[in-house]
């Protein structure tokens, strides 16, 4: 009994000397039956947004325990997101790809949810057009969202809007929240045509038309800084020729490129004064200018063929006629008959 009292006295003295257990921040008084652990996570994202999450967990034990208030730092995966619109040749469907790019050598970030918003007026509010989550409900909205965890890409598809639209998608992962914005310009891209000149050279014509939208801040297509470049690998190819053309009664700006090889998809970097965007354009139809020339060449070849046939027929008729005239003009030799003999009686 005395030994037990002595041990209790020593424990009490030690408790007075160490009033708490030091963690990363503070400590609390012990509780005989309950344990309360409060964890506060402070996260700083790449866009300077700091969030704090406080979690309180209560457990019951049959023995004495210690309540600790600890602050921990959860390290999230550093990444950025680049989104790019994609046009089809008929411009009916909307396709876009958001690529997640890691900034550190950690494993791929676990994207928990993606929410996309859109607006057509620069001053109007954004409305939700798509939602994708690792937990049900899944994929709700006007756009179809699908995430490829292996390629770390978000694929967005739907009907093409009738006017230029701003999009923003929020990516949520463990300890991270990142916003990515991109624009779908219904104009000024009027058309993109590709023509294979020979086995090694291809000509690409990009036609742009004037487009007034709040995103362009009043910038004009005919501004000296307005231009188009083609992406070929890691290089930006400038246009070989820039001119103003009229097509179907519309005034257009034409950019001509010459590429080595044959392509059905080109990536365009369009810059209108201070505003720029990159888009992937798929062209399947051949250049109508080339088709017009081909038709003209075909008609010319047909006319030449008909002239040759006409000359040949004329020559044959003339030759036959000359042969007939020759037969008529040939002297007819009279056949000599003997002098008739009359018998005299």
UniProtKB/Swiss-Prot annotation:
**Record's keyword terms, sorted:** Glycoprotein, Host-virus interaction, Immunoglobulin domain, Membrane, Modulation of host immunity by viral IgG Fc receptor-like protein, Signal, Transmembrane, Transmembrane helix, Viral immunoevasion, Virion
Question: Which residue positions carry a glycan here?
Answer: 34, 48, 95, 104, 148, 179, 198, 217, 225, 241, 244, 260
Topology: which residues are Intravirion?
Answer: 318-345
What is the role of this chain? Serves as a receptor for the Fc part of human IgG. May thus be involved in interfering with host Ig-mediated immune responses.
Q: Where is the Ig-like V-type domain?
A: 91-190
Q: Does the keyword Glycoprotein apply?
A: yes
For membrane topology, the record states: Single-pass type I membrane protein
Query: Where does the sequence pass through the membrane?
Result: 295-317
User: According to its UniProt record, where is this protein mainly located?
Assistant: virion
Q: Which residues lie on this side of the membrane: Virion surface?
A: 24-294
Record region (Disordered): 23-42
Q: Name one GO cellular component term.
A: membrane
Annotated signal sequence is: 1-23
Name the record gives this protein: Viral Fc-gamma receptor-like protein UL119
**Subcellular location(s) of the protein:** Virion membrane
State the gene name recorded for this protein: UL119/UL118
């Amino acid at each position: 009994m005395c030994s037990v009292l002595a041990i209790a006295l020593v424990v009490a003295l030690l408790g007075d000397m160490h009033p708490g257990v030091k963690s990363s921040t503070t400590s609390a008084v012990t509780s005989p039956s309950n344990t309360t652990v409060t964890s506060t996570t402070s996260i700083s994202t790449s866009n300077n947004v700091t969030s704090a999450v406080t979690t309180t967990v209560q457990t019951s034990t049959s023995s004495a325990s210690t309540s600790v208030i600890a602050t921990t730092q959860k390290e999230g995966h550093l990444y950025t997101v680049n989104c790019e619109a994609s046009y089809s040749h008929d411009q009916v469907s909307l396709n876009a790809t958001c690529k997640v790019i890691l900034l550190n050598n950690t494993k791929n970030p676990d994207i928990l949810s993606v929410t996309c918003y859109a607006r057509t007026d620069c001053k109007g509010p954004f409305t939700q057009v798509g939602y994708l989550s690792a937990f049900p409900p899944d994929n709700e909205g006007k756009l179809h969202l699908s995430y490829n965890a292996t390629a770390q890409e978000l694929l967005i598809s739907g009907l093409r809007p009738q006017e230029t639209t701003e999009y923003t998608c929020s990516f949520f992962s463990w300890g991270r929240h990142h916003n990515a914005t991109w624009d779908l310009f219904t104009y000024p891209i009027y058309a993109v045509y590709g023509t294979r000149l020979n086995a090694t050279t291809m000509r690409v014509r990009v036609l742009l038309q004037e487009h007034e939208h709040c995103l362009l801040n009043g910038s004009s297509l005919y501004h000296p800084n307005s231009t188009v470049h083609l992406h070929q690998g890691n290089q930006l190819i400038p246009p070989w020729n820039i001119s103003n053309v009229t097509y179907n009664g519309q005034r257009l700006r034409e950019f001509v490129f010459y590429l080595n090889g044959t392509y059905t998809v080109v990536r365009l970097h369009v810059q209108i004064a201070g505003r720029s965007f990159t888009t992937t354009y798929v062209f399947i139809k051949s250049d109508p200018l080339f088709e017009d020339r081909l038709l003209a060449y075909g008609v010319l070849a047909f006319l030449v063929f008909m002239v040759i046939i006409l000359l040949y027929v004329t020559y044959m008729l003339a030759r036959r006629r000359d042969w007939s005239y020759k037969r008529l003009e040939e002297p007819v030799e009279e056949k000599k008959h003997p002098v008739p003999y009359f018998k005299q009686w």
